[in-house]
Regions:
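N-terminal export signals
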Residues: 7-27
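Short, glycine-/small- and polar/acidic-enriched structural segments
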Residues: 27-171, 175-179, 196-202, 219
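Solvent-exposed, polar/charged alpha-helical surfaces in well-ordered, non-transmembrane soluble domains
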Residues: 53, 75, 79, 93, ...
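Short, solvent-exposed loop/beta-turn-alpha elements that line the ligand-binding surface or hinge
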Residues: 57, 123-132, 223-229, 296-305
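Sec/Tat-exported extracytoplasmic proteins
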Residues: 81, 86-89, 96-99, 145-150, ...
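Pocket-lining segment of extracytoplasmic ligand-binding domains
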Residues: 182-277
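Secondary-structure end/capping motifs
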Residues: 244-322
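Conserved C-terminal helix/tail region of periplasmic/extracytoplasmic solute-binding proteins
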Residues: 314-345
Length: 345
């Protein structure tokens, strides 16, 4: 795949970043509906943009619906129940494979921020830690009950990929348990022994560790799976017809997110304050651990890097979530909407 498009995007977006996403004053208010999966950290900018008044600055009245899985976000987008999906790229590839057209219009997280988190009981029994060899860790998952948010999710995709690396079959060699997105309930389920571990997004890893319920066992965004480094995961997407009909509103939304991402990088104290508001389960030690992992993969602007996209595409082809052909960067990423959002003054 030639990445000349990426270089052009990078130069334009880099110049736009220098402008630090100035406020956009709008006289009229436009209503827009969005969806997201629970309150994982990828969607923190969605919350922060509202708290900072950036939607209002952009002339938007944003209604947010939280869903228990990315599959449900995708269903809401393609059924016109919401205008924009804030989700994982897994859902986008799954929709495209099912011939339900959508386009990427922005980025929320430039790392696979889903971890395998295992219970203290499992760790004690196996004597394994995150520092153990990757294949030893994957093989130790054989026969275990592993929680996922739901079928077809990014949490399932991670389990599928890891098992494939070890020559295992996740449908035969493990029991995948649908646990939804309620973090407190998931931790209680793991503590009680009803599941041995869970595949789940940040900040659950940090909450589990600070509450002494379990520990991060395999953390792709932190480099534990070399082949998964630097692939985009948190994304913003919409249907092509919605983009065509509501382009100014979508540009304004992505701009507000980009402005928020830039702000969070510049204001660590306010970022901590907003994280406490976003997720009341986060203690100060959990926030410390979360920020150390999250800030390196939080975009400084909402562009989508072509190399990062290509890595995500190959991952999802291997796991069967993306079709074996097509889905090129040019086909899936709406660079016009994305760059207009970045360049908006």
């Amino acid at each position: 795949m030639k990445l000349t498009r990426k270089r052009a995007l990078t130069s334009i977006a880099g110049a736009a970043a220098a402008a630090a996403f100035p406020a956009v004053a709008r006289s009229a208010t436009t209503s827009i509906s969005i969806g997201q999966i629970g309150n994982s950290v990828a969607f923190f900018p969605v919350f922060a943009a509202k708290s900072l008044g950036y939607y209002k600055d952009a002339g938007l009245d944003v209604t947010t619906t939280s869903f228990s899985s990315g599959t449900l976000v995708g269903t809401a987008v393609t059924s016109n129940s919401i205008d924009i999906g804030n989700s994982v790229i897994t859902d986008v590839f799954a929709l495209l494979k099912a011939n339900r057209p959508v386009k990427l219009i922005g980025s929320l997280c430039n790392g696979y921020y889903v971890d395998i988190i295992m219970s203290n009981q499992f760790l004690e029994a196996t004597k394994l830690t995150r520092a153990s060899k990757l294949m030893d860790k994957i093989n130790a998952l054989k026969g275990k009950k592993i929680g996922i948010t739901g079928p077809g999710s990014g949490t399932q995709a991670l389990v599928d990929y890891l098992f494939q690396l070890a020559g295992l079959d996740p449908t035969r060699d493990a029991e995948l348990v649908n646990v939804g997105v309620n973090q407190a309930a998931i931790l209680q389920t793991m503590k009680s022994g009803r599941i041995d571990g869970v595949s789940f997004a940040w900040p659950l890893t940090m909450i589990a560790e600070t509450n002494n319920v379990g520990k991060g066992f395999i953390e792709p965004a932190e480099g534990d799976v070399p082949s998964m480094r630097e692939q985009i995961q948190g994304v913003i997407y919409a249907k092509p017809d919605v983009i065509a009909k509501r382009k100014p509103a979508l540009i304004a939304y992505v701009h507000a997110i980009g402005r928020t991402e830039a702000y969070l990088h510049r204001n660590s104290g306010k970022t901590r304050e907003l994280l406490k508001q976003y997720d009341g389960a986060l203690s100060d030690p959990a926030i410390d651990a979360l920020l150390a992992a999250y800030m390196p993969v939080l975009p400084k602007q909402p562009d989508i890097d072509a190399n990062s996209y290509e890595k995500a595409l190959q991952f999802h082809r291997l796991t069967g979530f993306a079709g074996p052909a097509g889905n090129t960067y040019a086909d899936v990423v709406d660079t016009d909407t994305m760059l207009r959002a970045i360049r908006t003054k």
